[in-house]
Structure formats: structure tokens, C-alpha cells
């Protein structure tokens, strides 16, 4: 501890004296003064009377001081007796302190001993206020000084007082401990601390005493300097002092004191100066400046927000006033020191000033341009980690919802009145890491699209996180309360701002992992902000990835569900699902159980809108870019921000319709709440007892946002608060259905779970006899366990200590230990039975977080659930009776059921129908594909078979053609023979009719006949050859039939003829032809000769046969029958005659010079023969 000695001389004119800061303004520059002091080893002068106030020395000449006067050095040690008066420490000076000082200085200067002894006798009964560092202020105006400026000095010696009114005592210090007096009080405090390090040059006291006289002589010479330059200097000093580095260093070097003390400094001129909470001295103007005081009263008016009744009592005891114009009081922080200095003229006033309790409003000199907080009462403190003090200053108005790890409330500050969103989280060892992670993320995020973090409050059992209060709630709340979805313009505005927030988070290597409409909030100005960082993760770098399976099931990306490495692009998938939620009102696959739908997301195609045609192609394309299964192909947030869908600049006016509807709905609900409150208060006033003062009712008080509810009560922050709240039977009021309600774990969902458990228990009792049915029931139970709230955030892991058991209650330590032991035994048994099968059992904690654990035995489940039910009933009973020691979280209403929610059986039927339709459609496609493939195979096979057959049949066809050609070649000579035979027959007939003669005439006639017959037969042969050629061609193409089919029709009419031609040529003898036809069965008529001459070239016709068939290329067996002459036709003589005529006509036309008589004779003879043969 260092001491202070102040010396003051009251002899002199008050006109020549000036205040401390008026003399500071006369200095040319601070740097010159420091250089002059360091070069001349000058020292500051201390002046003090027996009072506790600083006064200006008024000595006019150095003759008042002894010529060889040197002050004694301060003693090394002194013990001070302290007494507590009025809440502050006032230190009394020891009577023997100055005697010790004088005895130590007798060896140096005997002349000064007498003066010191006289002064010590006068100062036996005076008081001295001590600070942690001693300050000396000299405002001497005497002439003859070298520096001409007042000095401020601090040292670590004891403090002695001097009460003489006639003489002036000055104590000099070492030059390294001096500071320039033109630095104001705040700069003095900082630089005095730095000078306290150098305390080794105490041997220069005599030189400094000699220089002090010269310093006093120059004071009056510099009083008339230019004030304009001094004002410039003070401005520079103010800028130097106001730097934050200077204040931090000065505060860090100050020693701490356990008390809160006041500082009062007075001058003889009526002006006063005060100290700041850190001991820095600031000036006060004198009574000569009343106008300046009036101008600055409004600026220095004490704000009412810092008033508190506890601090008010303490400050009333410690504050003291002498006169309103000369004194001031300051209540500083607990670390600030105090200094009370008064003059002998005001000692009587200091003893009686405790009676008057009037706080004087402080002002400051306009020339200094320094503003320091005055009359400040410490209400709460925020350190560099943003940890607050003052838990009871906040009031929780209503519960806004449940986050990933805690419940969110609306809170207001009692004194300041500002509103915040307070997230109340129960302190658990298992969740400490996640809590610290969330706080670190919020602390480092500073973006207009991210919820701001204002600090945290911590108790033994809970921690409060102070966040932005978004009055309009989340997008999910707006959709539920208004029962309307967003249009394209509104979706683009929300998505664009959400993307900006995600881009900022990803630039900080943060993955949100829970992007959904319930976590996108709207402030009063429709600013979009991302909230709830309970499951977020900060990666180590841009290339780092995460593997943890966490998030809300229906919003999770496929790579997160498959537990693959994923990065910030998982948030883009969640943003796409959020777009569907804003457009359709609900996320996709909401009709299915959330866990089952989550498992099917990687297998199903990416989801789309319920009605894609309802939305523009740009929005559909934007959604398709977000919902790409492959994260590498998925678009980045920067690419999506440049998408044409988001190019239009849309402001918050787009949401005006929804906001207006929201406020109308909330006004109606608030009016209903008021009516209910009035009705309840009227009933409770007649029956219930008066409430405790801690509980407040805000039934008619609607906050600035118009969203506050009726009854409020703070969460107990300490054991004392819990005792205060013991008599409170009030609970936190909750918002009504759809009003500012976050989707999460709703406590009323426990009833639904209990009903399921009861039904399962009954089923198990009925099926105990059949083991197979028990296994089926177990499978059904596992499926039913997956039916959880699809809007709750899910964390998948093996174990989590301290988590809830599905009912929001907290189990005791013994229960936790028992559960851990049972879980260990169960795990060992399961591993022995089947290591691959892991049955998951979902549980929901009080904060809305769904925890996935390994399956427990049924007995342990039932016992834990029964315990939880008992705990819930006990807590409800206590809260109703008014003896609730712990705060009970309010119940949330049931979530709005979706319009198409149906029973489980209908869901299974729908699944079956969907599966069947899907299978049918897929089967139809497969069948059509198979048919097409079969047709192609058939065509290809047929083509191959045709090619092979053609290749194999080609030699057969060639052989047939060769056979036909051979037949043709063989048939030609036979036909020639037959024709020759026919001609011979004709010749014989002709020759038979006249007598044969050997005359040359007859020979010539015969020769002529032969020539004519040859000539006539030649064209016939040519025709027959052409017919044969055409017949061969047609036979190759037509189907070949066997000869038996044709010959069977002619078996009865077949004939055989034998011709014996005996030609003899002798001397002038003629040739004769003998025809002896031999008939088998039936005689061939002579009409058949016609057919022999015009027979076709078919291989069936031959000259040897008795019949000649007219068979063309397209003839058939019916044609053959048609041309065969039947006996009935032969019987008809007329028909025979006509045919004979036709035959004769043909022969006459065919043979040019043949005589008709011959032909008729021959034909008649032939016909007669045939008729006779037929008759036979």
C-alpha cells in the first residue's frame, strides 16, 4: 500500500489561482513537459491540509518558504487503523506517523525538523482516506517556477497531512515517479501505475526540493498563455486517454479491493473533481459555469434502468454531500478504490452530510470533451465469454417450443424491459460437450441470417442461452396457424435468405444438419434467421467430413441415413425437403412411419411436389437440383443462389399477407385468453388464497410484440429461488394450438405411447402359450416403436447417459446405474445369440430429441415406464398442491394431425395396393419387352431356317430340272414317232379306199401326201415343243403330284395299241401300213386321235398310251376328268357328229391341200369302229 501526502497553502489571491484543468490547458504540449521533467529531475509538489479535499496553493512568492527547506522522506512502513462507516472504508492516520517521518529526516536538515514537529502537533486528530496508490496534486500559482505547470505525482510511501494555513510544505519525489500535470485524471491513473515500478531513485530528494521553488516561481508567468492552444492539447489528451488499449491496461494493473468505495475531491475555488470506477479522476466545473451545468444535465442524467433497491440502500449509506455545487458522489464497481479528501473549512459539513441523502447530478467541463459514467449502480455483468450475472432479473413469459436439447421460452428483463428468447437446458454430463459446441457455434456466428447470441446464464442444474426473439415465430408455426401454404414469391424470399445463412455457416466450416421450416424463424421485420444449432457440427477444415447419423428423419439426406461421409451438401437436401414443406404444407412421405420412410429414402426416387404442374418450371428445376441423391452431383449453395428462380429481388413485403393473417388470428386468441383469465381470476379470488409476491400475472399486459401470455413464473436458478417458489402454484402458460409452437416432443404424446404399451401388454398375455405368435408380436412391437413424431430431431447412437426415458422426467442416479447394469447384461446376451441383429428402440427425451438405443428386455421397459408414470403423477400432484420444489415444464398441445392420417390397417392396405400397382406396372413393361424379344427371335429363326432350306433344297430342284429336261429330250422322238404313225395311218386310209397300183401316178400321189403331211406336222411339232417348254417351267413351280392320282381316273378307259408298220419298197411297188389296235377293257374311239395330235408336253402323256390328256400348267384332276370322254357322251350320236365335224374342220384348217373326202371317210370309219368297240 502506498500513501498520499497533500500540501496546500491558503495564503494568496484566489484570482491568481486556477483549477487543475485550467492550468492543464496552458501547457504547450504533453511531450515537451515530459521531456522537461525528465531532464531537470523535477518533482511534483504535494499540498494537503488536515482535511480530505485537494486545494490550490495561493503563495505569491518563494519568500514564504525557508531557503534551505527540504521535506523529510516518507517512512518505510506505517500501520493504519480502519473503521467502517456508512458502508465504506475510511482510514485514520496514525498519530506517530509524521513523528517517524521527522525523526528520519533530522540527520539531513535540522531547520526543517522544527517545522515538521509543529505541523505534526497540529495534525494529531486529523483523518486521512487511503487509496491503494497515493496521489499528490499541486495547483500552485506562485511565480518563479521553472515548469509553470501543476504536477500530479504518485508514490508508494505513507501519507502525512499538514494543517498549517501560513506555511507551505512540499514533498518532492523521484523524477521517474513524476507525471505531467496537464494529463487529466484518467490519464494520471494509468501513468501513475506505470511509474510505480521505478521506485529506486530516492537519493535525489535534495535536488528536487531546490527545483520545486523554481517551479513555483514560473506558475504565474504562464497563467496568461493562449487558451486556444491549451484546448487543442486537451483534445489530443482526450483522444489518447479514450483509447481502449489504455483503459484495458490500466484496469488490469489496478489492485483489487473487496469493498465498494466513494471518492470526493474538493478545491478551494468551489470546483470539484471526481473519480471514475477505476480510480480515474475527472474534473467538475465551479459555480462560475451554471449555464454549462444546465446544458449537460440531460446528458448526465442517471438512467433509471440501472436503479435497484439493494444497491440503492448501500449507496445511500456510503454517499455524502457537503454542498450541491462543490461535492459529488460516485458509486463505482467493486474493484474500484475510494478517496475522501476534505478541507478544514468543510470538516463540520462532512460530519453532518450523512443525514442528507440527495444524489447530486454530476456534470463535466465542456473543454475536456471526456464523458465518464457517473452515479452508476452495477446491475449485471457480462464477461468476455458472454456469461451474465443476475439470474433473477429475467422473467419467462411463455414457452415457445422445444429445440434439439432444451425448451425455448420468451423472456423479458425486469429493469431494462428488452425481450429475448431464452433456451433453458438441463445440465447433464452427457450433454455438456454438445452444449459447449452449440454455445461456441453461436458465439462465433455473426450474420443477419443467423440467430444472434447474447450470452448465457448458468446455475447448478440449468443453463440459459440468451438468443434473438423472433416475434413472428417459425415458418412451420405460420403454416399451422394460418392453415395456408406459401406461394412461389414467398418461397423464393425465404429460400434466398436461408441460402445466405447456409453460405455463411459453410464458410465457417459449420454443418447445420437440421434445416427445416421449424428452424427458419421470422423477426418482427420479417428477417429470415436460422436457429437451433443443437445438432450442428463444426468441421476441422473445408475438406473434412462427418459420419454421425443425426437430424430429423424425413429431412435427412441419403448419405446421412447410410452413414457415409458427408459434408455441407447434406443441408442442401434438407433445404429441398423444406421447400416441399412450404409448398405442400407437409414434408414428403408423412403418411408413413418416419423411421420406415427414412430407411426407404435411399432406395426411392427423389421426392417432388404433390402437384408439380401447379408450380413453375424454374421452381421444379430448382427443387430437382437440391434433391439429387449423389452429393457430388448435387448443386452447391452458391450455384443455387445464382439460379434464375432466385434472381428477382423480393423484399419482406411478400410476406405481408401471411403476417396480417397471423396477427388477426393471434389477436382473437389473445382476446379469448383475456376472457378466460378474467373468468379464472373471478373464480379464484373467491376460493383461493392470495398469491406470493414472486409470481406475477400479466393478464392484461400485452408486450410490445403482442404475443405474451397470461401467467409467468421464473425457473428456479438457485436453492433460495426454489424456496421462494415453494408457495407458487402457478405454472408457465403455453401458447395455444398452432401459435408459436415449435414442432418437437410433445408431452401429451406419452398418453399415446402408454396406450400402445397397454395394448402390447395385453397381446403378450394372450399369446404366452404360443412361442411362434410371441415372435410375431415382438416384430410388431419393433415396428410400432418406430412410430414417433416426424417433426422431432433424432440422434442415433448406441448409448446416451442421463437421457430421458420418453416422458421428459429425470431419473435418479440409482435408476441410471441399474439401467446401465441391465443394459450391459442384455448386450452380452444379444452378442452371444446373434451379433448381426441389432434391435433399435427409440426413446424421446424432454427436449424433443429422439434417442436410439439398443433394445431392452420387456421387464426392464415396463418397470422403467411404471416408475416414470409414478414420477409424473407425483410431480403433477405437487404442482397442483402448491408444494412443487422443482419447476415442471408446461404441457404442449397435440400437433395438428395431417388431413390424410389414417389407421395402421389402412396404411398397410395402401402400402399393399401401392406395391401391387408398382409390381403390375413393372410386370407389364417386362411382358411387353419379352414379347418384343420373342418376335425378334422368331423372325430371326425363320430367316435362318429359310436360308438353310433353300441351301438344302437347291440341289434337289436342280436334279428335278435335269430330270425334266431328260424327259423332254426322250419324249421328243416318241412324239415324232407317234406323229409319223398318225400320218402313216392317214396315208393308209387314203390308200385303202382306192385300189393300190404300182403306177407312177400313185407313187407321186403318195409322195405328195407324205410331203404334205410332213409339212403340216412340222408346225405342229414346233408348237408341241413350245408347249413342253412352258409345261416344264410350270411344273417346276407347281406342286408335283404322283401319276397314280391321275391314272386312277383313267384305269377303266385305258387302251393299248400296237402298230405294225411294214413298209416294203420294191420296183415300182407302194408302201402299205397295217394298223391292228389291241384294246384292253374298252375300245378307244377314233376321236382320241385328236388328243394324240394335240397332246401336251406333260410327262404323263406318252405316244404309246391309248389316251392323250390335255394337261396344261395349271390343270388338275378335275380338268382331266372333264376332258375324258365318257360312254354317255359316246352314246349321243349328235354330239359325236359335232365333234367329228370340229375335228374335220381342224384337220382341214391344219392341212392345207388334204382333201375333205379323205378325212371324212377316215373319220367316219374310225368313229364307226369306236362305236362298235364300245358296244361290244
UniProtKB/Swiss-Prot annotation:
It catalyses: L-seryl-[protein] + ATP = O-phospho-L-seryl-[protein] + ADP + H(+); L-threonyl-[protein] + ATP = O-phospho-L-threonyl-[protein] + ADP + H(+). GO terms for biological process: intracellular signal transduction; protein phosphorylation. Residues 767-789, 813-844 have a biased composition (Acidic residues). Residues 64-76 have a biased composition (Pro residues). The active site is at 514 (proton acceptor). Its EC number is 2.7.11.1. Belongs to the protein kinase superfamily. STE Ser/Thr protein kinase family. STE20 subfamily. This is Serine/threonine-protein kinase pakF. It comes from Dictyostelium discoideum. The lineage of its organism: Eukaryota, Amoebozoa, Evosea, Eumycetozoa, Dictyostelia.
